[in-house]
Structures are given as C-alpha cells and as structure tokens.
C-alpha cells in the first residue's frame, strides 16, 4: 500500500516538473512579452507547489510572496512602463555578437556545473533539517545573523535595478516627446 501511495506521489512530482518545463519553454517562445511574464508567474507558482510537495512550507510561501507577488509584478510594471513596439513577429538574427554571447553563456554554465559537482557540500546546517519544530526559527536566526550582509546587499541591488529601470524608461519617454 505504501508503494502505491509513493508511486502516486512520484507521478504528481513528475507532473509538476513537466508543468515547470512547459511553462519555461512558453516563457522563451512566446512572442508577446506579457504572455511570457504570465507564463513566468505560472512557472514560479509551480515551483512553489513543488516546495509544498516536499514539505518546505516556508520556501513555498516565500516563493509566492517574493517571486510571484513582487518580482513578477515588477516585471509586468516594467513592461507596461516601457512602451514597446506592437510587433507580433520575432526574428532572431544569429550575428557575431550573439555567437560570442552564446559561447560565454555555455562556458559559464559548464563552469558552474563543474564547480557544483566538485564542491564538498557540508552538513553544517543539518540541525535545521532534523529539528522539525524550530525550522522557521532557525531560518530566521540564520537569515538575520550569518546571512544578514548578503540579504541586505541583494535588497540594495534590487533597489538600484528598479531605480535604473525607471530612470531609463523616463529618459526614453522624454526623448520620444521632444
């Protein structure tokens, strides 16, 4: 009976992953950028569902609040702030710059995979995984003590990106009106 229950769970996990893959491909291949952003929201929501499936409630709620609720809304806001041409066709020309960019991206991906495979992952925070009662408490303590500086630097980087996007959009709008 447990085997049957486990096989249902495995099927559900594979279906969620399939939905993530299909949604990610939709983000890439949609011609309309608003549809791509909505597809991204679907992918991020399915990732949160996968977190729930693996009993990571805090990560699932954080995924929904931060990525689906804030980042995706920010992306949609930026899309609507910057007036794009109403072109429905997308033509990709494979130029020398795109070849260099593709080579750099593939090289970076291979390097990251190599680093990930060679890294000896420590079990320093196994206490968080073993102690079910204080999971959120321990994450909060680590976030506000050991990882406070990276957390604040990421929030500062997001603020700078938002200010830069708004200033670029305003600069382009003032050029169009003149």
From Swiss-Prot:
GO terms for molecular function: NADH dehydrogenase (ubiquinone) activity; quinone binding. It is found in: Plastid, Chloroplast thylakoid membrane. Pfam families: Oxidored_q3. It catalyses: a plastoquinone + NADH + (n+1) H(+)(in) = a plastoquinol + NAD(+) + n H(+)(out); a plastoquinone + NADPH + (n+1) H(+)(in) = a plastoquinol + NADP(+) + n H(+)(out). The keyword Transmembrane helix applies. It is a multi-pass membrane protein. It is an enzyme of class 7 (translocase). The chain crosses the membrane at residues 10-30, 33-53, 64-84, 100-120, 148-168. Keywords: Chloroplast, Membrane, NAD, NADP, Plastid, Plastoquinone, Quinone, Thylakoid, Translocase, Transmembrane, Transmembrane helix, Transport. Its EC number is 7.1.1.-. GO terms for cellular component: chloroplast thylakoid membrane. Its main location: plastid. InterPro entries: NADH_UbQ/plastoQ_OxRdtase_su6, Nuo/plastoQ_OxRdtase_6_NuoJ. It comes from the Eukaryota. The keyword Chloroplast applies. NDH shuttles electrons from NAD(P)H:plastoquinone, via FMN and iron-sulfur (Fe-S) centers, to quinones in the photosynthetic chain and possibly in a chloroplast respiratory chain. The immediate electron acceptor for the enzyme in this species is believed to be plastoquinone. Couples the redox reaction to proton translocation, and thus conserves the redox energy in a proton gradient. NDH is composed of at least 16 different subunits, 5 of which are encoded in the nucleus. PANTHER family: NADH-UBIQUINONE OXIDOREDUCTASE CHAIN 6. Belongs to the complex I subunit 6 family. This is NAD(P)H-quinone oxidoreductase subunit 6, chloroplastic. It comes from Chara vulgaris (Common stonewort).
């Amino acid at each position: 009976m447990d085997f049957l229950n486990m096989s249902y769970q495995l099927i559900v996990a594979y279906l969620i992953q399939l939905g993530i893959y299909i949604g990610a491909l939709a983000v890439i291949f949609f011609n309309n950028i608003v549809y791509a952003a909505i597809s991204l929201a679907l992918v991020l929501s399915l990732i949160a569902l996968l977190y729930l499936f693996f009993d990571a409630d805090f990560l699932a709620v954080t995924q929904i609040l931060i990525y689906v609720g804030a980042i995706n809304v920010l992306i949609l806001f930026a899309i609507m702030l910057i007036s794009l041409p109403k072109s429905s066709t997308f033509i990709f020309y494979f130029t020398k710059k795109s070849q260099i960019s593709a080579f750099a991206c593939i090289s970076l991906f291979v390097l990251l995979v190599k680093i990930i495979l060679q890294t000896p992952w420590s079990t320093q925070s196994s206490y968080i995984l073993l102690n079910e009662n204080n999971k959120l408490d321990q994450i909060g303590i680590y976030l506000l003590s050991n990882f406070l500086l990276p957390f604040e630097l990421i929030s500062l980087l997001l603020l700078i990106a938002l200010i830069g996007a708004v200033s670029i959009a305003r600069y382009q709008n003032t050029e169009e009106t003149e």
